[in-house]
C-alpha cells in the first residue's frame, strides 16, 4: 500500500516538473546545436539518482507548496560549489535552470536573483531551514526567472568574488607580467675585441700599469656589461691569456706579504705598440659593434690610447724629455741678465749664400784661445742640470743626432738673421785702425753654435759691410773667432799684428 502511494506521488512529481519547467522537445529541435552545452540537454534521467535517499514527507510538502527546487537545471555557479563539496545527497544541492534561461546566465539580474539561493545553501548542499517557509513568486514560463524578496538579494561584488575567483587567479599574474618585461635590463652583445685586447685596456688605464686578476675582471664588467651576466667561463679565458700571451708579464706585488697570493700583471713594454695597433685594427673593422657593446661608448679612444707613466714606450719617453728640455732652454731666464758693455752686431749679409750652404755644422772640441785670455762673458751651461744629465744617460745618441739635425737646419737660414754679437770696444778699434772685412779671404769650415749667442733677442741695428770680395773661409769656434792667413791680399790692407789672434765675440 505504501509502495503504491509512493509510486503515484513520484509519477505525479515527474509529470508536473515536465509540464512546468521543461520546454517541449520541439524547442530543442529549433535551437542551434553549437549553442547547446552538455548541461543544457534534457537531463531527467540523470537527476533520478536522488530518489533512493529522498525524504517522503518533505516531498509531499514540496508538492503541495509547489516548490520547484529539485527540477530546475543546474546553475554553472552552483555547479562549481557542488564540485567543491562533492556531496549531492540532498535534493537542494541539485538546482537546475531551464534551457530558456541560458541567455541570461551572465546577466546581473539572473545572477542577483539566484545569488540568494546560493547564499542560503551551505557548501555541503543541505537546505537552510529558512527556505522551507519562503514562497517564491512564479513568473511567466518564457523567462523562467525566480524573483525573491529585495532583502535576500546579494550584491554583484559578492557574486564576482565568488564566481570569478578561480579565473582571477590566472588573469592577474598575466597582467602583472608586462611591467616586469619592461623593467628588464638592456642586453649588451659580446665585444668583438679579443681577451688580450680587453686585458691590455685594463692595464693601460690603471694608475700603476699593473693590476691583479680580480681588478681586471672588474674593469671588463664595468666597461663591457656583457660580462656581468655572462657565464663564469670567460674568467678562465682571461687567466689563460695572462699566462700564455707574451704581451703580459707577472710582476711581484711588494705590498703583499705572500709570494703566492696577490701577484700583479703588467704589460710588456716592448709589446705596447703592437697591442695598440691591434685595438685600432678592430676599431676600424667594426666600430658600431664595439660601441654597442660598451657601457659608455665615448670612452673608447681614451681606453685605447691612454697609458700610465711607467707604460710609455722608451722612444716616446725620450722624445717627451727632449721636448721638455727645449722648452726650458727657451725660457726668458736663460738670457744673460747682466750686460756690462754695449754690444754691437756684425752682419754677414755680404757673404754669398752658396758659401754658407756648403759649410757644415760640427761640435767644437775646444776653444783655440790661450789660457790667459778667458772670455769676457760666459753663457750659462746647461750640461750640469739634473734634467740634462738624466737625458744624456738614457739616450745620449738620440740627443746628439737631434742636435746635429738642428745645426744642419741652421746652415740653411737666411744670412740676414745670422748676426754675431761683438762686445766691448772692438768694433771702434777695428774702425780706427781702418780694418775692413772686405780684405778677408775665404772662410774655413768650422761649427757655429747659435745657442751661445742670443740672436734676435736684442733690438740692435745690424751693421753690414759692403764690398766686392767674398769670404771663403771664416772660422767660428764657440766664443772665439780666428782669422787665418790671408791670401792674395795686399799687406797694407791687413790689420797689423792680427795673425791668428782670436777675437772674443762675447
Swiss-Prot record:
Transcription factor that may play a role in neural and some non-neural tissues development, such as retina and lung respectively. Binds to an 11-bp consensus sequence containing the invariant tetranucleotide 5'-ACGC-3'. It is found in: Nucleus. GO terms for molecular function: chromatin binding; cis-regulatory region sequence-specific DNA binding; DNA-binding transcription factor activity, RNA polymerase II-specific; sequence-specific DNA binding; transcription cis-regulatory region binding. It holds the Pfam family Forkhead. Its main location: nucleus. One of its GO terms (biological process) is regulation of heart contraction. Keywords: Developmental protein, DNA-binding, Neurogenesis, Nucleus, Transcription, Transcription regulation. Residues 190-286 bind DNA. Predominantly localized to the developing eye. Expressed in the eye anlage at stage 18, where expression increases between stages 21 and 26. At stage 26, localizes to the prospective retina. At stage 29/30, expression is strong within the eye vesicle, in the midbrain and in the nephrostomes of the pronephric kidney. After stage 30, expression in the nephrostomes decreases until stage 33/34 where it is largely absent. Expression in the eye decreases after stage 33/34 until stage 38 where only a few cells in the ciliary marginal zone (CMZ) show expression. It comes from Xenopus laevis (African clawed frog). InterPro entries: Fork_head_dom (IPR001766), FOXN1_4 (IPR049624), TF_fork_head_CS_2 (IPR030456), WH-like_DNA-bd_sf (IPR036388), WH_DNA-bd_sf (IPR036390). The keyword Thylakoid does not apply. Transmembrane segments: none annotated. One of its GO terms (cellular component) is nucleus. This is Forkhead box protein N4.
